[in-house]
């Protein structure tokens, strides 16, 4: 659903583009600054707030050109561009955080890695930096996202990556061989229930012995606030019919929203138990990996650090859960970040 009502890209000399935004949630100007044809900075100036600077996609690794930016904005929208800019720095930080603590793979290993649902490449770029000697397959069902990703990749990384457009997520015929690591970042929640039950076993079968399946940034089904689509409290505890009625009135959707589309957008999130149940249909023994690394940071702090808009409801939830952690030691996070190891064949 397109949210941008108007968009103008006005070159100012050869160095700056300004994208004018009129959006029901975001407004103001998005400014891209270039030097010698390469993106150097991006800023969002809201109509009613202070200017905010963003770390642009593939910062520090891949040069982003004026053509890249135009493709990103015109293939999708200006609000999508803002989302991409907001997420990029967080995805790299979250990848380091989760992989350091849960995955347990040497960073210098010569692995074969699948980033399934790679989209425009945030998680793939983070993995490229984390595993400098690995080879990658980036797979997605959306061809236009892969086009954006191809436009970013520098020559040094193109030799390490094969990009594959998936035609049927239930069969995955385009994927050959086995993988040492399969990564799904912000993917599982967008699969319909039947797709989850068919896809995860297919991916698990393609995992090498002692390989890792990593699922990150998936909303937790039972968190007090539905953070992914509606930002409404308690909707996770409502029956489907009532949850759909609330979603239609949330301001993010309209009266034509169907339950199937709401599920596709990720309204119900997932649980670790559901993921394990889906994997259990495939061969191999499942072992959920846990961290033995003491650290003052945890998944609750990881969520709060990555939130771009700290609403009053989210702030209250964070404060309450912080007190729960202090009193009981229990860490409750709105996001599922989990890693499984395939320890042996059945």
Please give the residue ranges for each predicted region.
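Conserved glycine-rich SAM-binding loop
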Residues: 119
């Amino acid at each position: 659903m397109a949210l941008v009502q108007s968009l103008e890209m006005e070159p100012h000399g050869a160095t700056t583009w300004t994208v004018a935004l009129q959006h029901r949630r975001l407004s103001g100007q998005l400014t891209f600054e270039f030097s010698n044809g390469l993106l150097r900075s991006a800023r969002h100036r809201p109509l009613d707030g202070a200017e905010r600077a963003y770390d642009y996609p593939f910062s520090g690794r891949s040069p982003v050109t004026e053509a890249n930016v135009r493709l990103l904005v015109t293939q999708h929208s200006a609000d999508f561009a803002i989302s991409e800019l907001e997420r990029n720095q967080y995805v790299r930080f979250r990848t380091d955080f989760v992989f350091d603590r849960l995955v347990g793979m040497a960073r210098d290993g010569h692995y074969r890695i699948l980033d399934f649902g790679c989209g425009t490449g945030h998680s793939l770029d983070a993995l490229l930096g984390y595993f400098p000697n690995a080879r990658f397959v980036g797979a997605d069902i959306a061809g236009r996202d892969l086009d954006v990703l191809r436009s970013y990749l520098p020559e040094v990384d193109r030799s390490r990556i094969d990009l594959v457009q998936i035609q049927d997520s239930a069969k995955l015929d385009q994927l050959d061989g086995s993988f040492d690591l399969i990564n799904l970042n912000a993917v599982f929640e967008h699969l319909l229930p039947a797709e989850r039950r068919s896809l995860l076993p297919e991916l698990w079968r393609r995992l090498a012995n002692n390989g890792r399946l990593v699922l990150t940034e998936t909303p937790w089904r039972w968190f007090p606030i539905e953070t992914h689509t509606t930002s409404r409290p308690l909707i996770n505890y409502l029956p489907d019919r009532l949850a759909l009625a609330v979603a239609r009135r949330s301001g993010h959707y309209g009266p034509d929203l169907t339950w199937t589309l709401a599920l596709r957008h990720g309204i119900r999130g997932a649980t670790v138990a559901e993921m394990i149940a889906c994997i259990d249909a495939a061969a191999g023994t499942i072992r959920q990996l846990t961290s033995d690394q003491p650290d003052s940071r945890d998944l609750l702090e990881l969520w709060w650090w990555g939130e771009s808009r700290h609403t009053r409801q989210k702030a209250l939830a964070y404060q309450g859960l912080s007190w729960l952690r202090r009193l009981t030691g229990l860490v409750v996070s709105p996001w599922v970040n989990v890693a499984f190891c395939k320890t042996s064949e059945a």
